[in-house]
Amino acid sequence: MVSVSEIRKAQRAEGPATILAIGTANPANCVEQSTYPDFYFRITNSEHKTELKQKFQRMCDKSMINRRYMYLTEEILKENPSVCEYMAPSLDARQDMVVVEVPRLGKEAAVKAIKEWGQPKSKITHLIFCTTSGVDMPGADYQLTKLLGLRPYVKRYMMYQQGCFAGGTVLRLAKDLAENNKGARVLVVCSEVTAVTFRGPSDTHLDSLVGQALFGDGAAALIVGSDPLPEIENPIFEMVWTAQTIAPDSEGAIDGHLREAGLTFHLLKDVPAIVSKNIDKALVEAFQPLGISDYNSIFWIAHPGGPAILDQVEQKLALKPEKMKATREVLSEYGNMSSACVLFILDEMRRKSIQNGLKTTGEGLEWGVLFGFGPGLTIETVVLHSVAI
């Protein structure tokens, strides 16, 4: 008779969960940040609000964003005028867009990840799909399974409306799945489309304008598994440790509410201060067991909620400017893509590390950290181990 402990041992992988491939995708429509205020106030019939437009221009100028990609084109917005008003009932119109576009964009990223992985898609055992928009049944996980032609018995996990910290959440979940299911290969997809949050400006709700200045659309996909097959699978990063915590005294710092007018976001001004105040504790918990206390000796992937968060984290920890280079590059070229952002940064870092002839996928360094920040205020922490190039 086989014991339960023997069964459990046989079910578990031997090595750590490893990122084996990364793919990214964006809508074709690219908007330049410098001219976006003109477009935004024109398409929302708000050009008479000259002072508000000047404020929005300053927000865009300070955002450290050069361009973003958006599903919403001028043509689509003209066909859906309710989406352009500040709080007009428009959820049906938004839903009709995102329930199609979220899985479609996710498929585009997933196809790239599967191609890089080099294994047949029939070997995918689990699917994690994450999006802030488009709640529907059956969900985007089901739609993606159909779009990709995955096996009907792939084990699916659907995460809706988690927000900007969820890039860390999907990695934490993928790690647990890969390490506790021998031979598992987990397809992770984060697909974010701002059609659910776009709306016209309001003089009385400047926090809504902040979101209009920062958010962009994008999807990222990973293949995660333990015990990579030699000569077949190519490890990129190993995931060593994960944690999630709610920052103390942070209730109401970041909220999102689904209304007839779409998804509304509410931000407090002290979000950067809350993040920087709590990041040291998260780092100590993560790196003390490794004997690491010099945070300039590790590579950094932080959700770029906005330049103020990155600035305050750098200042609090006395980080060298180059530590956030990959993070700032993604913010600059894509804006804040919510959960997908940190996965884009993983891709950016490994690509630049290879291009620059460095020794590891983590900018030549051995250890690194990935942070997700979002509603709650929730902080996700992932300790990464780079791979030799």
From Swiss-Prot:
Coiled coil: none
Domain of life: Eukaryota
Pathway: Secondary metabolite biosynthesis; flavonoid biosynthesis
GO molecular function: naringenin-chalcone synthase activity
Listed PROSITE patterns: CHALCONE_SYNTH (PS00441)
Gene Ontology biological process terms from the UniProt entry: flavonoid biosynthetic process; polyketide biosynthetic process
Enzyme Commission designation: 2.3.1.74
Active site: C164
Family recorded in the similarity comment: Belongs to the thiolase-like superfamily. Chalcone/stilbene synthases family.
Protein name (database record): Chalcone synthase 3
Gene from which this protein is expressed: CHS3
